[in-house]
């Protein structure tokens, strides 16, 4: 019929989810190039939006499972979003629609539910400890950055040979106790693994687009022209304003487990004895003095120079993993920020399709089934008589007893390839279902490979040129706006006329049966193309059971009749007994490749397979960037008291005065970290996300080739009588009885007609009761390999399997060749003097000193040298008056 009048243009809809990967259609005839319209004027900048308030930080979630790389579909043309209708039956994935105009930015959503905790990796071997670097100055604690992706564990390093015994350095004066270091988590030793892929950072908030220019007068839509030549690529637009700043800082993670105390260091050697002192003469015993007061703690001495490294000790016993810390309290849920103003509609730009992605790996070959016993060849059936054009529905017979399993017959010779069937009339469109609830945000998937290049669409008529506007200043980054309302659905187009059916092929001669050897089980074929939905017939009343008739020979294929009206679903019969296995038919030649099918629905995830054999270790990746310093940990335990030094020469007994408090000895060397503990219990899987919005159903696919005729099944039991359906609409006039068999035509196939618009969908019938389970059909010949299917969504993780049997303990490895002694590093710069440490505990009381003996009287020393004459002193004060003289 003629094309209907185009309705008014609805408001722009929200951006839909990317559709599945489309298949490349046949190239259209080149049309005349369209006229290039002048560029529109750039509108003035929009008002800046208000930034929303930041919500409270949520509870940190566990690391989610690594998503599977999904196939990236070709970027289709934007479709016009329709009004959500009732939920219809799930249709086939259709061709990508026209891309709609981008909607206004949405409001910032709540943080998603925490993802499921990943399964811990395999236990790595302990790598050789690296050389100790010079102690750097304590820097200020930086802000906690976002956690980067966890890199894969690197290959285990070989244990290094013990180094040469270092020289014993002089015992330095004890330095001041430094501040307690940050409490670190127990790290997994090993060689650094390759750098993981860069994390997908969250996209910045899109800037507010400028206000649209004054629209020109609306032109009358012209007829759709033929596909024009590919136009030149447009000029790249100016980059948008920068995104908003990063989100608020996350809650710091729980503190790591307390580190193990290092082993005590070796006792240093005794110092050389001093020169003997001059024995003094015994002095007189003095009066015992009063008890002195506690001495004042002296200023800590400067830190001694670092001595050479000592001999490496034996590795310590493997540490035990401490119990898991308690889960922190749930954070206060964040408050949704105020929605910003609705931004204007962006420009309608159609991107170019991406390059074709790589082909996925083939799946594992299934196990071969048990070969069945060889069956006797069955007799050939008689050809059935020509039946009427359309027979009435027979009465349903009772269910027969289960048959015995037949013996497979010999393989016959391959028959001639049949002519390709005629193309069926496409079915009518289904009513789009209502939009489902909004799903929770799932874990981010990895970037998919680029899909194949799609065909170039028809070029639309160019619009009138708008007035040139002044160039506006760049706008301020606005807050995300709310999504605009969905636009009204377009008027469905009229149904196109059916194509002219091609000539019918001649019937091939039956093949000669020969006894052949049983072939090996074939590989699992790819799924064939999906057939179109057949027409529904009206439900007839259930009749009494009739006897099973003899098997007739397959009749000739009739011409495709016109599509009848949509019927209502009839009642389904009760479940029948499983039928006997039929004879294996002869394998025919491969037919022509079928039409490209649409991707099937995603299958359910199977149970986890057995662990594969570990591959060889890959080459070490480049060194990662220096990580951000973590928060300062809790103060460690007080170190052990130093070992008692070697006894010096006996001194003279002193007075019994209490000495000052001793300084805590320096902590011992840190022991070698133990081996990694056993694998922890996997975390609880996160909640399943809500289903995403239902996409627009695509047009039905082309009808697939007819399948192989199966053995007739056992008659099922009569089902319950269905309800009377509504009377169907009048169908098109019939074509009469089948004519005589004509000679094959010699004309060339006509040009392919244009695809007609989608017809209206009929009313959906009420669902009938469950159908009868039919007998197992015979295995047909293997069809041609279908196109590469689109990889389905990753299923949810399965339940945890039972714990495996402990493996056999491996043999002790051969000791490696001692490595070459490394160069002695330069002496590190002395570290800065740390603050005074806490006062140590009181040391044990020393032994009670004995009373000293009286010393010898000292010898008379030599006469001293007379000193030089000093300067004259100041004049003294005047003396008192003298006595009076004699008169």
Curated annotation (Swiss-Prot):
Which protein family is it in?
A: Belongs to the fibrillar collagen family.
The answer to whether the entry has keyword Transcription regulation is: no
Keywords, alphabetical: Calcium, Collagen, Extracellular matrix, Hydroxylation, Repeat, Secreted
Point to the regions of Pro residues compositional bias.
872-887
Localization recorded for this chain is: Secreted; Secreted, Extracellular space; Secreted, Extracellular space, Extracellular matrix
GO biological process terms, alphabetically, are:
extracellular matrix organization
Q: Where is the composition biased (Basic and acidic residues)?
A: 51-65, 504-517, 791-802
Q: What is this protein called?
A: Collagen alpha-2(I) chain
Spell out the Low complexity composition-biased ranges.
1-42, 126-155, 170-194, 221-236, 278-290, 368-388, 444-455, 473-503, 518-533, 560-580, 595-605, 658-673, 690-720, 766-782
Q: Which GO terms describe its cellular component?
A: collagen trimer; extracellular matrix; extracellular space
GO terms for molecular function, please? extracellular matrix structural constituent conferring tensile strength
* Post-translational modification note: Prolines at the third position of the tripeptide repeating unit (G-X-Y) are hydroxylated in some or all of the chains.
Tell me how this protein assembles.
Trimers of one alpha 2(I) and two alpha 1(I) chains. Interacts (via C-terminus) with TMEM131 (via PapD-L domain); the interaction is direct and is involved in assembly and TRAPPIII ER-to-Golgi transport complex-dependent secretion of collagen.
Q: What does this protein do?
A: Type I collagen is a member of group I collagen (fibrillar forming collagen).
Tell me what organism the protein belongs to.
Hippopotamus amphibius
Expressed in which tissues: Forms the fibrils of tendon, ligaments and bones. In bones, the fibrils are mineralized with calcium hydroxyapatite.
Residues of the region (Disordered) are 1-887
Matching Pfam families = Collagen
């Amino acid at each position: 019929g003629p094309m209907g009048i185009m309705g008014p243009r609805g408001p722009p809809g929200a951006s839909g989810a990317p559709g599945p990967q489309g298949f490349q259609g046949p190239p259209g005839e080149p049309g005349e190039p369209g006229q290039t319209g002048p560029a529109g004027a750039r509108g003035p900048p929009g008002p800046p939006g208000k930034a929303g308030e930041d919500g409270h930080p949520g509870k940190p979630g566990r690391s989610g499972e690594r998503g599977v790389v999904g196939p990236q579909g070709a970027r289709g043309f934007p479709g016009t979003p329709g009004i959500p209708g009732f939920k219809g039956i799930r249709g086939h994935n259709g061709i990508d629609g026209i891309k709609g105009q981008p909607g206004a930015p949405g409001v910032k959503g709540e943080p998603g539910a925490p993802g499921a905790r990943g399964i811990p990796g395999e236990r790595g071997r302990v790598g050789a400890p690296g050389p100790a670097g010079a102690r750097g100055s304590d820097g200020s604690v930086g802000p906690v950055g976002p956690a980067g992706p966890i890199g894969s564990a690197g290959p285990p390093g070989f244990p290094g040979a013990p180094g040469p015994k270092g020289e014993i350095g002089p015992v330095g004066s004890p330095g001041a106790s430094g501040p307690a270091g940050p409490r670190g988590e127990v790290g997994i030793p090993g060689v650094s693994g390759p750098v993981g892929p860069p994390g997908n950072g969250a996209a910045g908030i899109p800037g507010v687009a400028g206000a649209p220019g004054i629209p020109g007068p609306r032109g009358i839509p012209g007829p759709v022209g033929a596909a024009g030549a590919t136009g030149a690529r447009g000029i790249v637009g100016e980059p948008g304003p920068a995104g908003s700043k990063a989100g608020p800082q996350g809650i710091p993670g729980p503190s790591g487990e307390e580190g193990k105390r290092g082993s005590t260091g070796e006792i240093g050697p005794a110092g050389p004895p001093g020169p003997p002192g001059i024995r003094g003469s015994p002095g007189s015993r003095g009066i015992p003095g009063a008890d002195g007061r506690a001495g004042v703690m002296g200023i800590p001495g400067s830190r001694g120079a670092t001595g050479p490294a000592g001999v490496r000790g034996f590795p310590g016993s493997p540490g035990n993993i401490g119990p898991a810390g308690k889960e922190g309290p749930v954070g206060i849920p964040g408050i949704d920020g105020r929605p910003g103003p609705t931004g204007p509609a962006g420009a309608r730009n159609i991107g170019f399709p991406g390059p074709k992605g790589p082909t996925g790996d083939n799946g594992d070959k299934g196990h071969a089934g048990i070969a069945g016993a060889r069956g006797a060849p069955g007799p050939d059936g008689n050809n059935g008589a020509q039946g009427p054009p359309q027979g009435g529905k027979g009465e349903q017979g009772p269910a027969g007893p289960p048959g015995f399993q037949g013996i497979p017959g010999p393989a016959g010779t391959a028959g001639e390839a049949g002519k390709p069937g005629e193309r069926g009339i496409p079915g009518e469109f289904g009513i789009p279902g209502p939009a489902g609830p909004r799903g929770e945000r799932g874990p981010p998937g990895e970037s998919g490979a680029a899909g194949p290049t799609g065909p170039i669409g028809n070029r639309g008529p160019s619009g009138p040129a708008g007035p040139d506007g002044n160039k506006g200043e760049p706008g301020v980054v606005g807050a995300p706006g709310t999504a605009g309302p969905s636009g009204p659905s377009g008027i469905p187009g009229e149904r196109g006329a059916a194509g002219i059916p091609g000539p019918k092929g001649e019937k091939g001669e039956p093949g000669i049966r020969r006894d052949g050897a049983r072939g090996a089980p074939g590989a699992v074929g790819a799924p064939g193309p999906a057939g179109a939905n057949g027409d529904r017939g009206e439900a007839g009343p259930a009749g009494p059971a009739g006897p099973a008739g003899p098997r007739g020979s397959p009749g000739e294929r009739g011409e495709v009749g016109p599509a009848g009206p949509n019927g209502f679903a009839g009642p389904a019969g009760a479940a029948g007994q499983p039928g006997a296995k039929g004879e294996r038919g002869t394998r025919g030649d491969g037919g022509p490749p079928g039409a490209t099918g649409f991707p099937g629905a995603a299958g359910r995830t199977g149970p986890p397979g057995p662990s594969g054999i570990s591959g060889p270790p890959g080459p070490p990746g480049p060194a990662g960037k220096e990580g951000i310093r973590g928060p300062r940990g809790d103060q460690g335990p007080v170190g052990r008291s130093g070992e008692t030094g070697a006894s010096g020469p006996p001194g003279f007994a002193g007075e019994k005065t209490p000495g000052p408090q001793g300084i805590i000895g320096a902590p011992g060397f840190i022991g070698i970290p133990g081996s990694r503990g056993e694998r922890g219990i996997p975390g609880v899987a996160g909640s399943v996300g809500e289903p995403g919005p239902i996409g627009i159903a695509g047009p039905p696919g082309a009808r697939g080739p007819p399948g192989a005729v199966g053995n007739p099944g056992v008659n099922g039991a009569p089902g319950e009588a269905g309800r009377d359906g509504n009377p169907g609409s009048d169908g098109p006039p019939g074509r009469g009885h089948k004519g005589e068999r004509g000679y094959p035509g010699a004309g060339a196939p006509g040009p392919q007609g244009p695809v007609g618009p989608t017809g209206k969908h009929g009313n959906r019938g009420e669902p009938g009761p469950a159908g009868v389970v039919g007998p197992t059909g015979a295995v047909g010949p293997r069809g041609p390999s279908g196109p590469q299917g689109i990889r389905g969504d990753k299923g949810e993780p399965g339940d945890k399997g039972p714990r495996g049997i402990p493996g056999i303990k491996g043999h002790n490895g051969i000791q490696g060749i001692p490595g070459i002694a490394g160069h002695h590093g330069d002496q590190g710069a002395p570290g800065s003097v740390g603050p005074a440490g806490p006062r140590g505990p009181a040391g044990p009381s020393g032994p009670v000193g004995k009373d000293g003996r009286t010393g010898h009287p000292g010898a008379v020393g030599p006469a001293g040298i007379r000193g030089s004459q000093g300067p004259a002193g100041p004049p003294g004060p005047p003396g008192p008056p003298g006595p009076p003289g004699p008169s």
